Amino acid sequence: MSHNEAMAGMNNLEMSEKAKPLLAAVIKHIRENVDPITDEYFRLGEGRADRWSHAPGQLELLETAKKKARENGLWNFFLPNAETGEGLSNLDYAYIAAELGKSPLASESLNCSAPDTGNMEVLERIGTAEQKEKWLKPLLAGEIRSAFAMTEPDMASSDAKNISTSAVLENGEWVI
């Protein structure tokens, strides 16, 4: 392949034919299962004092949309590994992520919301068998949520390589 042919291929920003039906299914899922519950979800949460918790009824609404997503095979497709995800390229996922970004509940309904997506990808790529069993499996199943902290005093928080905090096991407890 010549340099010009390689460059032409790199400039092709079209979604693959393989991913187009998935995009159509995602749009349909959002329209039929997420959009109809969104106003009620946020209405139910209006009076809660803690922004990090759910008000009664919110999780039930979201679980209904998640159940439909699972039934329709719209679950964890952001992962590039075809065994745990859909095997999409970053470009194909970008088209889908653009649709997910139009709805405040769409990503969560498909188990594709941050920080879980990044944490699952890290666990999938470099996690130990024990870490995958303990954390990746329940994350992939949508049974737990995860977190990633990367803001520190006097440290640029946009690049995880700059993190200086450490955790040391002392007397059976982790000291941060």
Please name every model-derived segment.
Residues E86, I126-I176:
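Glycine-rich, Trp-frequent "lid" loop and neighboring beta-strands that shape
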Residues G101-P104, E121, G172-V175:
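Glycine-rich loops and low-complexity Gly/Arg-rich segments
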Residues S107-M120, A141-E152:
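FAD-binding core of FAD-dependent oxidoreductases
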Residues M1-A114, R125, E130-K134, P138:
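Amphipathic, small/basic residue-rich leader segments at the start of a protein or domain
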